Structure formats: C-alpha cells, structure tokens
C-alpha cells in the first residue's frame, strides 16, 4: 500500500468515529472560547429540534461541522439542510465526481472540516488516492479520467475566473446532461458557502486529529 493509500485509509477510519466535540477541541487547542459552543440535542429549543433530529439521522458528525452554526438560524438551516440533502443524495452527478467537486472547493478554501469529512467519502466513491493526494498538495492531479478532468477544469474555472470557457462548456455538454451541468455548478457553489460557514464559525477537526492543512499552507 502506497503512502497516499495509507493516508486515505487513516482518514476513513477517523471519519467513521465522527467528532461531536470538535468545537470544544478548538477552544482547548487555541485557548479561545468557541464562537459557537457545540450544541447537543437536549439544548435545542422547539424551533431547532426538528432540524436537529433530521441532521442526526444522516450526519456522520452529529450536530458539529456546518450544522452547529446553522442551528442558530433554524429556518435558514432547514432550507440549507434540504439543499444539502439534494446535493449529496439526490443529485444527478455521479457520487465520485460530486465528491471530487466538493474536495476541489475544500482545497481552494483550505477548509479543514470540509476536507476531513469528504476525502474519505471521495475515496469510498472510487476517487483514486493519488488524485486526492495530489489535489491536497495543490497540484492539478495527473492520471485523471476524462470525466474527472472535466470536473476539475469546470469547477476550477468557474470558481477562479468566474466563468466557464466555451471550450470547457463544450466538453461538459459531451459528458453531462443539462441537469448534471446545473447540479455540478450548484454543488460547487454550495460548498463554497459551507466553507464560508465553517471558516466564520472556526469549526475544526476532531479532538486529537491533525488538521489536513498546516497553518499558512497555500
């Protein structure tokens, strides 16, 4: 097993354990009080509880990650949860490519939680450990299949140049349906928002787990 495979395997094991106390870890590690102390189900009020119950049915992180700040605005949180649900479990984009798009956004934002949560999911969906490792190193991954290269170019162009070139769009039309192109665009935009939410709230990785990206890493 190569080093990339070992790294992905360790992430998968860590993700399976979840991290309900992630925000508490942030306070201990930095000496700062968390911006949003971690909520538990018994702390939720009548407006928050329905959302919390839905989150707990599907979330590998409990009420942590983006859900912790989202619960502070439960009406918005419910609408975001419904969007997340579609973009994770009902999207027309194949799971491997969907998770690849999420990782591209996670790497651009150096989003510790986003990468920590989704790298194992991408690997489980069949994305090569080498592709994941090269993306993490901020390289254009080598050895990508045509559809993977298209997702990389489409998402990267859209988020860094604020447009999709005619050439890349023509490639997309050969590989994806109109619905898939729209869904791919939506998942990229959604996970920019998730990265923003995580950054604003200073949500972090699980207790005792090294963040994927070092401080100051570009």
Which stretches of residues belong to each language-model region?
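Hydrophobic alpha-helical segments
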Residues: 20-218
